[in-house]
């Protein structure tokens, strides 16, 4: 079912103690609130088992930032989808541009990650988006369509369980932001691609988040677009006042 969502991506930030403190602070900030969106925090693996029981599950969902493309076994340093799920986490970010760029994650690797996440009851937040050169060459639709191949071999039933997140890679951590019109244009293209593959009903029920330097000052304008269903938030998720300011954009 299509929902408004604000999901925080902590990336490689916060020690265990700092992460616990941040989660507690967010939980307290929302204690007397009824957000008009689903709120999710995606944390480094070390935080999951500590943070999940700390927050009010009715208001804050918890997820990981990645999982392995293998079920289990001799893969030193990897963390499986089953391990993530065993902490009580419900979500996992997959296909983030930083993992595609720095760790060589391909369409095939991501297919396996998505399937394992779903098999273990996790909701994938699947990221797609173009770099600056691709945007300047007007190839953003072509790039995004190719990235969607990682999830377009799912059954309609499984696809309906995922959340999509569009990242204009050129806007991540740069302070640049796609204009509301640019965001709406690419989100509408993504929804039309989903409709072409799975039909209008599933497309209309798919949440598509915006993930590029979203902050309290621009969130309301971005979220006002008909095909923008919330945000995948990086830097602003590390400060409760900023993160709550984005959540409040739906109020």
From Swiss-Prot:
- Where does it localize? Cytoplasm
Report one GO cellular component.
Answer: cytosol
Q: Where is the active site?
A: 96, 167
Record GO terms (molecular function): triose-phosphate isomerase activity
A GO term (biological process) for this protein?
Answer: glyceraldehyde-3-phosphate biosynthetic process
Tell me the route in metabolism or biology where this protein functions: Carbohydrate biosynthesis; gluconeogenesis; Carbohydrate degradation; glycolysis; D-glyceraldehyde 3-phosphate from glycerone phosphate: step 1/1
Question: Which keywords does UniProt give here?
Answer: Cytoplasm, Gluconeogenesis, Glycolysis, Isomerase
Domain of life from the UniProt record: Bacteria
- Residues reported in the UniProt entry to bind substrate: 9-11, 173, 213, 234-235
**EC identifiers of the protein:** 5.3.1.1
Catalytic reaction list:
D-glyceraldehyde 3-phosphate = dihydroxyacetone phosphate
- Which NCBIfam families does this chain map to? tim
Any idea what job this protein has?
Involved in the gluconeogenesis. Catalyzes stereospecifically the conversion of dihydroxyacetone phosphate (DHAP) to D-glyceraldehyde-3-phosphate (G3P).
Q: How does it assemble?
A: Homodimer.
- State the family it belongs to: Belongs to the triosephosphate isomerase family.
What is this protein's record name? Triosephosphate isomerase
Gene that this sequence comes from: tpiA
């Amino acid at each position: 079912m299509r929902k408004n969502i604000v999901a925080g991506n902590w990336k490689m930030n916060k020690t265990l103690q700092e992460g616990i403190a941040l989660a507690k602070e967010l939980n307290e900030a929302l204690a007397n609130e009824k957000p008009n969106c689903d709120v999710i925090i995606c944390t480094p693996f070390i935080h999951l088992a500590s943070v999940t029981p700390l927050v009010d599950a009715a208001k804050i969902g918890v997820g990981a930032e990645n999982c392995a493309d293998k079920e289990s076994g001799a893969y030193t340093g990897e963390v499986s989808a089953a391990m993530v799920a065993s902490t009580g986490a419900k979500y996992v970010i997959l296909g983030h541009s930083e993992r595609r760029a720095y760790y060589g994650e391909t369409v095939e690797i991501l297919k396996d990650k998505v399937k394992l996440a779903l098999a273990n009851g996790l909701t994938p937040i699947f990221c797609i988006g173009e770099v600056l050169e691709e945007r300047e060459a007007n190839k953003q639709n072509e790039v995004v369509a190719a990235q969607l191949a990682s999830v377009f071999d799912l059954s309609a039933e499984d696809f309906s369980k995922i959340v999509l997140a569009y990242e204009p890679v050129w806007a991540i951590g740069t302070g640049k932001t796609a204009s509301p019109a640019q965001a709406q244009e690419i989100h509408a293209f993504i929804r039309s691609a989903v409709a072409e593959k799975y039909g209008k009903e599933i497309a209309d029920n798919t949440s598509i988040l915006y993930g590029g330097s979203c902050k309290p000052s621009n969130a309301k304008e971005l979220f006002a677009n008909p095909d923008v269903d919330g945000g995948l938030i990086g830097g602003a998720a590390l400060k409760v006042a900023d993160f709550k300011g984005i959540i409040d954009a739906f109020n």
